[in-house]
């Protein structure tokens, strides 16, 4: 079993299930005044990056430019809980249109009919593409992997 912190955990069945789920990610970042922020957000896993999208005027983009270190959690709320914890660096790219990964996320979250319909309402809208490169990965499944406080 891969150790907590290993990028190999991204291939674990728990990670794969959560990365393919319709659960929102929770993006944690540092605000301009140094305080922590957490926001729920749609995501798409490319196999290498967690990609988020945001309106180009979203305040979080300024904060990510100042400090690109982030944490992402994707979890479910059925016992036994499953949690994917990721730390990494966010790279923000401004686009003239909808991010391709946002289209994929919309289809996953809304379904094959409503997802493309939603994206079509956004066509031509500038969007920020936020690609997070994982540097640390952890999994909790409350069966074989527990929070570290329970194993001390």
Region locations from a protein language model:
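Short, solvent-exposed cationic patches
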Residues: 2-7, 57-75, 112-116
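Charged, gly/pro-rich active-site loop segments
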Residues: 1-10, 82-152
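Short beta-strand segments
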Residues: 22-56, 62-64, 70-74, 83-86
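A generic secondary-structure signal marking the coil-to-beta-strand transition
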Residues: 15, 23, 48, 82, ...
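Short, basic/aromatic recognition patches
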Residues: 2-26
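Short secondary-structure boundary/capping segments
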Residues: 16-17, 42, 62, 120-122
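Short, surface-exposed beta-strand-loop junctions and turns on beta-sheet-rich folds
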Residues: 58-60, 79, 146-147
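Amphipathic alpha-helical interface surfaces
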Residues: 15, 57-60, 98-102
């Amino acid at each position: 079993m891969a150790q907590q912190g290993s990028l190999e955990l991204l291939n674990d069945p728990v990670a794969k299930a959560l990365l393919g789920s319709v659960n929102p990610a929770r993006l944690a970042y540092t605000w301009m005044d140094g305080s922590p922020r957490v926001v729920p957000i749609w995501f798409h896993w490319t196999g290498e990056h967690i990609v988020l999208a945001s309106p180009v005027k979203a305040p979080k983009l300024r904060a990510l430019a100042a400090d690109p270190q982030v944490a992402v959690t994707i979890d479910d709320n059925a016992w036994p809980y499953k949690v994917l914890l990721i730390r990494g660096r966010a790279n923000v790219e401004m686009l003239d249109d909808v991010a391709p990964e946002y289209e994929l996320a919309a289809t996953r979250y809304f379904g094959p009919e409503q997802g493309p319909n939603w994206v079509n309402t956004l066509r031509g809208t500038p969007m920020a593409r936020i690609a997070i490169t994982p540097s640390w990965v952890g999994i909790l499944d409350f069966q074989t992997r527990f929070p570290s406080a329970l194993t001390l």
